Amino acid sequence: MLMLTFASTSSDLLPMSNVFDVQSSVFYNEKNMFYSSSQDFSSCEDSSQFADDSGFFDDSEISSIGYEIGSKLAAMCDDFDAQMMSYSAHASDRSLFHRLLDFFAF
């Protein structure tokens, strides 16, 4: 026969002094938390050590591309709405459920 024994208190299982000992000094030390595993960027002498990204984000080019994409998307949505409205005008003899199924199948 197998006999199980249980500890009478939780202190018999684990010593209380070791259960909740957590080293939390790292969480409160901002320098160690953010910069412990990386290099110190304040030691850089000049900007030649960093990549040159001038001209990468040209605002006028990004604005024109965004405007072009937005206008094409708006035109596509308008065409879709017009097609759906014309379809619903011709399919008035169908039930509402069938029109809903046709909408999602379209």
UniProtKB/Swiss-Prot annotation:
Residues 73-81 are annotated as: BH3-like. Pfam families: EGL-1 (PF11430). The keyword Cell inner membrane does not apply. It is found in: Synapse. One of its GO terms (biological process) is actin filament depolymerization. GO terms for cellular component: cytosol; intracellular membrane-bounded organelle; mitochondrion; presynapse. Disruption phenotype: Mutants block programmed cell death. In an ain-1 mutant background, enhances the proportion of animals arrested at the larval stage, with egg-laying defects and with a ruptured vulva. Keywords: Apoptosis, Synapse. InterPro entries: EGL-1 (IPR021543). Plays a major role in programmed cell death (PCD or apoptosis) by negatively regulating ced-9. Binds to and directly inhibits the activity of ced-9, releasing the cell death activator ced-4 from a ced-9/ced-4 containing protein complex and allowing ced-4 to activate the cell-killing caspase ced-3. Required to activate programmed cell death in the sister cells of the serotonergic neurosecretory motor (NSM) neurons during embryogenesis. Required to activate programmed cell death in the sister cells of the M4 motor neuron and I1 pharyngeal neuron during embryogenesis. Interacts with ced-9; the interaction results in ced-4 release from the ced-4/ced-9 complex. Interaction with ced-9 may enhance interaction of ced-9 with drp-1, but not with ced-4. A ced-9/egl-1 complex may recruit drp-1 to the mitochondrial surface. This is Programmed cell death activator egl-1. The gene is egl-1.
